[in-house]
Amino acid sequence: MIRLQRITTADTDLYSYMEKLMTQSFPSEEYRELEELRKYTDTKTHFYNNIIFHNNSPVGLITYWDFGHFYYIEHFAIDPAQRNGGYGKSVLNHLCQLLK
């Protein structure tokens, strides 16, 4: 079962997992400076930094913005060891249901 968990920098292990996956999955010019990302995660109430879980094991990350009238997915990555298992499709379906 897919589950999203919003995180902050206080969730040290999960936040470290997210930063590692972010830096592995995207070129540095495609994500904010990590210090800025930490600030956004902790202070921007309409920014959602989430770990994706499947059966209570982390399998990826998804960040998005809630602008009231629409949502904007900023980053979405599945852990390389978990890719090609259908998680991407499952996450997008789950998110569509969640944000209806």
What are these regions (language model features)?
Residues 51, 57-65, 70-77:
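Conserved beta-strand in the GNAT
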Residues 97-100:
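Conserved GNAT acetyl-CoA-binding A-motif
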